[in-house]
Amino acid sequence: MWSTKELEAEVEAILSEKISKNWTIVLYNDDLNTFDWVIECLVKYCGHDTVQAEQCAWFVHTKGKYAVKFGDKYTLKPIYEALLEKGLNAALEQNKS
């Protein structure tokens, strides 16, 4: 059985993880998706303008991966899932503080 303090601590930990802005969607390079498709997905799902999406796509291509979106886990998870559904190779990662 949980004490009130233990329960409060557990709830606080869960909430801080969910609302923390320490999360990132990292997009990885692959040989399947075209620049145009990646740019289109970044504009549609991440809310980037075309220039920002083009820059992100170029960084992904040249560096192998790039953090394309930052925020809290609750906000980023549906974006991350949409990118995966569209065939992009992405990860949802918690930044180390």
Regions found by a protein language model. Give the residues of each.
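Terminal domain-initiation and capping elements
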Residues: M1-S97
